[in-house]
Curated annotation (Swiss-Prot):
GO terms for biological process: translation. Residues 17-80 form the S5 DRBM domain. Gene3D superfamilies: 3.30.160.20, 3.30.230.10. The N-terminal domain interacts with the head of the 30S subunit; the C-terminal domain interacts with the body and contacts protein S4. The interaction surface between S4 and S5 is involved in control of translational fidelity. It comes from the Bacteria. It comes from Burkholderia cenocepacia (strain HI2424). With S4 and S12 plays an important role in translational accuracy. Located at the back of the 30S subunit body where it stabilizes the conformation of the head with respect to the body. Belongs to the universal ribosomal protein uS5 family. The keyword rRNA-binding applies. Part of the 30S ribosomal subunit. Contacts proteins S4 and S8. This is Small ribosomal subunit protein uS5. Keywords: Ribonucleoprotein, Ribosomal protein, RNA-binding, rRNA-binding. The gene is rpsE.
């Protein structure tokens, strides 16, 4: 099965959402009459203010696969609580054999993350973060692991509500 990785491409549409294509793979289905070629695209969409979504599209041609992936990403968006352009706290995410460590960073640090994780943080609007991946570097699994970690983010107000305390008690 032949594989083809595309460079990460960015696009901003009129609705204010940022779109990035992470990868395009050429896939082959072998049938009695020969081979059937197709394409699978992986994309992320964000609003630059903490909302993020991931989509995967499959089709016989690349533009159709990318369009399907973008539409799915828009449907799967969720909100991540950010604090001054970075994460609230350190968090671990896992999907399959991919594991990621996501940590907040001081202002001026920038996005220190590799490959597909960088695209996720760019479209989400995170300016300062440190991220490390362990295990599998499959782009699909890395994006899913990153989103798993981002879903685990909680605000001080959430923690205070769970513990039955005030936000001031939680923050010290």
């Amino acid at each position: 099965m032949a594989k083809m990785q595309a460079k990460v491409q960015a696009d901003e549409r009129d609705d204010g959402l940022r779109e990035k294509m992470i990868s395009v793979n050429r896939v082959t289905k072998v049938v009695k009459g020969g081979r059937i070629l197709g394409f699978a695209a992986l994309t992320v969409v964000g609003d630059g203010d903490g909302r993020i979504g991931m989509g995967k599209g499959k089709a016989k041609e690349v533009p159709v696969a990318v369009q399907k992936a973008m539409e799915q990403a828009r449907r799967n968006m969720f909100k991540v609580p950010l604090k001054n352009g970075t994460l609230q706290h350190e968090v671990h995410g896992k999907h399959g054999a991919s594991a990621v460590l996501l940590a907040p960073a001081k202002a001026g640090t920038g996005v220190i993350a590799g490959g597909p994780m960088r695209a996720v943080f760019d479209v989400m609007g995170v300016q300062n973060v440190v991220a490390k991946s362990h295990g599998s570097t499959n782009p699909y699994n890395l994006v899913r692991a990153t989103l798993d970690g981002l879903r685990k983010q909680s605000t001080p107000a959430d923690i205070a509500a769970k513990r039955g305390k005030s936000v001031e008690d939680i923050l010290g």
